[in-house]
Amino acid sequence: MISTRLARAGALAPKSRLFLGTRAFATVGDSPLDKKVEMANTEKGNYINYKKMSENLDIVRRRLQRPLTYAEKVLYSHLDDPHGQEIERGKSYLKLRPDRVACQDATAQMAILQFMSAGMPSVATPTTVHCDHLIEAQVGGDKDLARANEINKEVYDFLASATAKYNIGFWKPGSGIIHQIVLENYAFPGGLMIGTDSHTPNAGGLAMAAIGVGGADAVDVMAGLPWELKAPKVIGVKLTGEMSGWTTPKDVILKVAGLLTVKGGTGAIIEYHGPGVTSLSCTGMGTICNMGAEIGATTSMFPFNDRMYDYLKATKRQHIGDFAREYAKELREDEGAEYDQLIEINLSELEPHINGPFTPDLATPISKFKEAVETNKWPEELKVGLIGSCTNSSYEDMSRAASIARDALNHGLKAKSLFTVTPGSEQIRATIERDGQLQTLEEFGGVILANACGPCIGQWDRRDVKKGEPNSIISSYNRNFTGRNDANPATHAFVASPDLVVAMTIAGTLKFNPLTDKLKDKDGNEFLLQPPTGEGLPAKGYDPGRDTYQAPPADRSSVNVAVSPTSDRLQLLAGFEPWDGKDANGIPILIKCQGKTTTDHISMAGPWLKYRGHLDNISNNMLIGAVNAENGKANSVKNKFTGEYDAVPATARDYKARGVKWVVIGDWNYGEGSSREHAALEPRHLGGLAIITRSFARIHETNLKKQGMLPLTFADPADYDKINPEDTVDLLCTQLEVGKPMTLRVHPKDGSAPFDISLNHTFNESQIEWFKDGSALNTMARKSGAK
């Protein structure tokens, strides 16, 4: 059920059994919050400041005089100015002080290059870098890792030396996926973290507000500046009942994605609550929060509970769990807190779901999936099943998957489809190796990949089908846009729980329902797979495996960060030019994008990841995946000056060489997907002025602003249809003011009379400074130079 009215937590959600005691406003008294509790075992001197958070909440409560959702509590407890900050959900821009920053290696390169240009000796906020994106899956874990270390040596050496220089924790290649490492080591209840990856919200499984951002936002926080976020609305998801059988936490978010769609969470935090929460493991809650990125949510969160305490204890952080219990009344929603929208899901009635193909919000319950395959003529044969990724690679996930594989092996069966396994971290890999699940999955036919992102982000040297050949794959990943996993636009990629992935690889077909359909064993006897089983936490504790962490040295003065001037992978940054103070007249439309334009379309990953530290080289992939509304083709646009069709980046470079600015016209939810700021840096670098769309995804809109570009939306979305890609336009930049529309004057290609289109924007005063100065980094440099 979905309710779009303001919904009170107390009225619609009975008191949770997460903890005994009151859920009202009561604030925490003296002593307990004065303790010095470090936020991570890998660091010294970085403390959890529940006392400051509590004081901030007291100030905000006196001002607002109303109950708060849990999401609001975490954000407002991190306000830079709780006394003076304007607070209105969906409208105000909050200036916040995050506790931590986390960066993955593909985005960390540009973030660190930008931080270096700010001229500071060390980061002002605890920061870590995680090497997980640059390892291509080819033959298997150790060999793929060795190959990656050789190919990416220049980048890894840069990151290792830069993190040592600037007091940043460094997780080496093979350590695991950023979000699993964060959950195991850095996430803590009530904390606020930003990360340069869109699936940063994974840490919501430990009651943390963890938000994906672009590298420029990360640089601000690393430099000690407050971070700005438009105050999100809060969508409540009340969970009742209890999961059993084949239903998993993944099915909760697959269901929610189907209800809210890929843009339904934009501008909102998804807050889970209700008695059903207690039936979920901590890592299961992480799974749900992780994939909230697919519905555009700012982040997703669960309230602190005993399952989280158990996980903290299992990961050698019981002291943090004990401290959180002292602050527990503020680690959940207030009685009577209101949500902007409420969804109710009964876990006892929830079916396993499969989402896809080509979009993560096309949700189908397993009971109707066979019919959907037939109706839509999706390729029935299942070519590959893939489990793991940052979304589903916990001990519980691997244990349940192994139980299904063992059931099949006991009946003389193995995987009929190709099958891969991606452990989420070295700790997970070592633990499931010790406890036997890894051997079971290998015996079943699984190829164990490196502890890294791999096929989930397109780092997959797939060779079993030809490019352009229609085929089906199913994974426990989070994202399944066209061509994302294997660069084959004809691959039908489906997303499900690891349990369903393993079951379907046994049958080798999409038309298999393990809840009802029988298999034949080696002797031809029919049998039904048993529902999966698996412990949420290892009974023998976690095995840390190989040591893959590099702490910053005590003396950083002698560390040098070298970037070769001839490198094709790393390039020191030059500042962007400031705005010239004039309207832009007679400029071309580089491309009018038709339909879905994700960050994968704007700046592809896969083989392009190696250029993430070299802005000019990676700009050669700008918008090559976007479909041109003029001709229905990708990477084919008409040059206004030559009349010839050419690649999008080549055309943009020609315009830049002529000193001509250009704009892009986009469709709905432009820039959905990952947090990669290259999708904003590239158009800025190649001379772009504005991106004008029906609507934007949140992170991409902010990234464009940070780089001195104008993200603008049609006041009337139907005006998108009035523009011909060969028209020229005037953009009246001098009209840029807070809360006021801007004008786009269109000069039609056919010579008919010009007409005006009204454009909206979400710039505030400080963001307008970014545009005028040329970028947020330029503004930072200007202000620091003036001090």
From Swiss-Prot:
GO terms for biological process: lysine biosynthetic process via aminoadipic acid; mitochondrial genome maintenance; tricarboxylic acid cycle. Its cofactor is [4Fe-4S] cluster. Its main location: mitochondrion. Its EC number is 4.2.1.3, 4.2.1.-. Induction: Constitutively expressed on glucose medium and increased expression on ethanol. InterPro entries: Acnase/IPM_dHydase_lsu_aba_1/3, Acoase/IPM_deHydtase_lsu_aba, Aconitase/3IPM_dehydase_swvl, Aconitase/IPM_isomerase, Aconitase_4Fe-4S_BS, Aconitase_4Fe-4S_dom, Aconitase_dom2, Aconitase_mito-like. GO terms for cellular component: cytosol; mitochondrial nucleoid; mitochondrion. Pfam families: Aconitase, Aconitase_C. Residues 1-33 form a transit peptide. NCBIfam families: aconitase_mito, PRK07229.1. The fermenting yeast S.cerevisiae has 2 aconitases, ACO1 essential for the citric acid cycle, and ACO2 specifically and exclusively contributing to lysine biosynthesis. In contrast, in respiring filamentous fungi the ACO2 homologs (acoB) seem enzymatically inactive and the ACO1 homolog (acoA) is solely responsible for these functions. This is Aconitate hydratase, mitochondrial. It comes from Aspergillus fumigatus (strain ATCC MYA-4609 / CBS 101355 / FGSC A1100 / Af293). The gene is acoA.
